[in-house]
Design a protein with these regions (language model features):
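Long, charged, low-complexity, helical-prone intrinsically disordered regions
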Residues: 1-390
């Protein structure tokens, strides 16, 4: 059996929850979206807004950004940990990350000394302060220590990061995006399942979550969706393929233009057939490169014919597009790139650049939908107007 790239990308768009904005949103819709996606990447760049808020916007439309913060730090429905990268994850999945925490705890002391050149007693000192004083952030480690000398803020931050990775500390809150760490026993809700899964159960969990999130996948997609280093997957691509072959409820097929075998849940096979000729989504969405759908550049290139170019790390003279440009999804195609920037002082969304993909011809319908989507986007960021430059 072989399916078209068109069907594969259409299934992914549906699986990613992009095709329909809900009529209304609440904290449950935020948590449910993250639960379905498996994880939501956190990033510090805020040219428009931080990445996690934008990925949710592409699926929920207008929503209260406080819903995400409250769900994580007040209601304790979500926790921060390494999944694809630094992510929000549902507490329903917590136990599947215990293995990664254990591995990091075993490596922690050696890696800390190697990275900082400091004695491991710094870890104990930082932990003691948090035990005595409650949640602390890196800024709290400035000024003289009681026994003389000075706190090295960078070293203490590294210590907290390592203990966070080891599951000893958790992020209890963020203030102005600054992470506050507390003892895990003070953060972890009592209802959370902390029974470690078996080795096989853990691997199957990450495979099935990738299938549910992406639709038609290759084995490498599992290692790239849940980054193999982040979750300490411990599986080669070949080993994942052997597991996929043995899973109940999973079908095999080829995708046009790729010699590798693809896999999908049986429940999605009939939908793949339907999607060959029927795909009702014909709207516009602005995506970011930190969006779950855009993580795997090779996958995006194959299914959409779109070359991902995250240019924030490039010098200006090496950029083809803009510093923080966004891919534009129209129906089942990535058709353009746009570079918005938020002027918060003037309450203005500034469009610094816009580029259509080769072969795409703008229509009146597309232009209207793009403008409508930008208006919704601007309102979400509390911009009173949109200004196009150039």
């Amino acid at each position: 059996m072989e399916i078209s790239r068109e069907s594969a990308r259409r299934l992914m768009i549906e699986k990613q929850g992009i095709t329909q904005f809900p009529e209304s949103n609440n904290k449950k819709s935020v948590v449910d979206t993250i639960n379905h996606l498996g994880c939501l990447q956190i990033d510090t760049i805020s040219v428009i807004e931080r990445a996690h808020y934008l990925t949710l916007w592409s699926r929920l439309g207008s929503y209260d950004k406080n819903y995400l913060d409250e769900s994580a730090y007040k209601d304790k429905k979500l926790f921060e940990y390494w999944a694809h990268a630094a992510c929000f994850v549902s507490y329903d999945h917590y136990r599947f990350y215990l293995h990664a925490m254990k591995v990091r705890e075993e490596e922690m002391k050696v890696r800390f000394v190697k990275r900082t050149g400091k004695d491991v007693e710094v870890l104990d000192q930082v932990l003691a302060r948090i035990k005595n004083e409650g949640p602390l952030c890196s800024k709290d480690f400035e000024g003289p220590k009681k026994n003389g000398g000075w706190w090295n803020r960078k070293t203490e931050k590294v210590a907290m990061d390592y203990m966070y990775g080891a599951g000893i500390l958790m992020v209890s809150d963020r203030v102005s995006f600054q992470r506050y760490y507390d003892l895990s026993e003070n953060v972890l809700p009592s209802w959370v399942d902390v029974e470690p899964p078996s080795y096989d159960e853990r691997i199957e969990f990450f495979i099935r979550k990738t299938l549910k999130s992406l639709g038609a996948i290759k084995p490498i997609d599992v290692r790239k969706y849940y980054h193999h280093h982040s979750v300490k997957l411990g599986q080669t691509t070949k080993q994942i393929e052997e597991r996929l072959k043995g899973l109940d409820g999973v079908s095999r097929f080829k995708v046009e233009g790729d010699k590798n075998t693809h896999y999908s849940l049986d429940e999605d096979i009939e939908r793949l057939d339907t999607l060959e000729g029927d795909f009702s989504f014909n709207d516009v969405r602005l995506l970011i490169y930190f969006d779950n759908m855009m993580w795997n550049r090779e996958r995006v290139q194959h299914l959409f014919g779109f070359e991902s170019k995250l240019e924030i790390y490039l010098p200006q003279d090496q950029r083809v597009y803009g510093y923080y440009h966004l891919p534009v999804l129209y129906g089942d195609q990535l058709v353009a790139r746009i570079e918005p920037k938020m002027d918060r002082k003037e309450k203005k969304l500034i469009i610094r650049g816009y580029w259509t993909e080769p072969g795409f011809n703008e229509t009146e319908e597309y232009t209207e939908k793009l403008e409508r989507n930008l208006s919704t986007f601007a309102a979400f960021h509390k911009a009173d107007e949109i200004e196009w430059l150039g």
